Every structure is written in structure tokens, then in C-alpha cells.
Amino acid sequence: MKIADKDEFEKQNVFGTGTPNTAYAKYFIGESYLNPLTKPEDGLHLLNVTFEPGCRNNWHIHHAKSGGGQLLICTAGEGWYQEEGKEPVSLTPGKVIVIPAEVKHWHGAKQDSWFSHIATEMPGEECSNEWCEPVTDEEYNKLG
């Protein structure tokens, strides 16, 4: 369900919006927020990531010698996920996306909806992230 109103979104966003994502703001167009659900030292770091309408992260790649990748679990609002060279996937609550290592991709909110997902990096060897170019307005506006 698309949710343009922030107050209404807060009622649906069961894991909470969290605080402004200042640490990674340079890799996002628009405002995003982070609410850590676990700590990195817990063994599995889960974050609830919230995107304001129109917000998306840059293209990026989760590298790993073996294993690795990322898992997204959509929790509120509506968003997009897209792998390079493939059609975008509409994200709604309950949708799970498994992103293998070495796949260039991006994710974020639809133009007219707040959006949240839980994100975690999959276990692997020699894991790292590479942030790439922004998703252009031209690319994004084609999504509808």
C-alpha cells in the first residue's frame, strides 16, 4: 500500500523510522533513516531502513570472495529494487529480495510513498561494499 503521509506511515512502520542516515547520506538521493534492530556484534546485523518518497540509494555492489550478498525484507510502504540490466521489481510489505554477491543494484521508495525494509548482509568471506553512481532522475522517473 502506497503511503504518502508520514504520520500514517509511522503507524504502519512497525520497526520504527529511526534516525537520519547521516553516515551514508552521500550514497542516497533524498532522506533516509536507520533503525538498528540488532548490533553488529550480535552476529547478524539487522537494520530497518526507511526512505522518504522518491529517495533511493546509489547503484552498489556487495562483493565477496564466497557467499555474501544482501537480504531485504519489505516492511511498510512501497518501493523499488532493480538489478543492472533487468526490469525493476515493485516492493510491498512481505516481499523478500535475495541479492547475490557481485550483482550491481539499487533500492528505494516509489515517488509517491514512504518505504521501509529490513536489510542485512549475508555471511561470506572477504565481504565489502562498492558504492557506484547515483540512479539518475531520468532512470528513476521512468519507473512510474
Question: Where does each model-flagged region fall?
Answer:
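A short, N-terminal "cap"/entry segment at the start of jelly-roll beta-barrel domains
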Residues: 1-45, 128-144
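A short hydrophobic beta-strand segment most commonly corresponding to one strand
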Residues: 98, 112-131
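Asparagine-centered strand-capping/turn motif at beta-strand->loop junctions
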Residues: 108-110
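Short acidic-glycine-tyrosine-enriched beta hairpin
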Residues: 85-102
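Short, conserved beta-strand element in jelly-roll/cupin
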Residues: 48-52, 63-81, 120-123
